[in-house]
Amino acid sequence: MAGPTALHLLLVHLRPAVTPGQRDALVEGLTPLRSLKGVLHIGRVEGTESVSTHDLGLFVYLRDAAALERFGTHPLLMKYLQQSFLPVVEDFVSMDVAVERGPAERYGAAFCFCLDFRPDTYDWQVRSALEQLAGNTDKGRLLGVSAGVALNQRQPFRAGGLVFAASPSDLSAVRLPPLNADAASRLVAVAGPASPLS
C-alpha cells in the first residue's frame, strides 16, 4: 500500500447488556463499506490485553483525505452508524491520522492507540516520538507500525495508529512514549487479537 494514507480509528466502549449477536453485527456491519471507492483495508482489534482502555477497536485505511471525506459522509456509513453502531456503543473515541504505511500483510494481533501531547508540543516532536516507537519495536516479535499525526486540529488526540503482531503475547514488545509532562500526556488503547474484515 503506497502512502501517505488516511487511517480512521474507532475505539469503542460497549453497553453492558450487549449480546454476542449485537457485537458481531457491530463488527460485520463494516464489511459492506469495503466496496466504497478509496477504502483499502478494514480491520478490528479485541481489547483483551490489560493496557486496553476500550473494548473494541475498528480501523479503516483509506487512499487519501479525499477518500476519507467521501467515506465519512457516505449513506452506507450513516446506515451502519444508526443500525449497528449507536444502539450498542456506550461511548467511543474517533480519530483520523495520516500514515505512510498500511497494515501488515498478515496479522493476528494489534495495538490500536491514540496519544495526546501537551499543547505546546510541536508536530515534529510528535512525529519524533512516533518514529521512536517504530524504531524501538522488537522487530522479531512485531510485524510493523502504522502511525502518524492527526489529519487536522479538530481531532481529539495529536497522534494515533496501530502496531501489528502475529499474536497478542507479542504485543508486550510495544514501547510507547512515556506518559509524563515532557512527552505524551494521555493514552487510549485497544490491544489484543485482531483480524481484517473480509
Which residue stretches match the model-derived regions?
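Acidic, metal/ion-handling microdomains and their immediate structural contexts
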Residues: 80
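Short S/T/G/P-rich N-terminal loop/turn motif that feeds into the first structured element of a domain
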Residues: 1-56, 63-73, 87-198
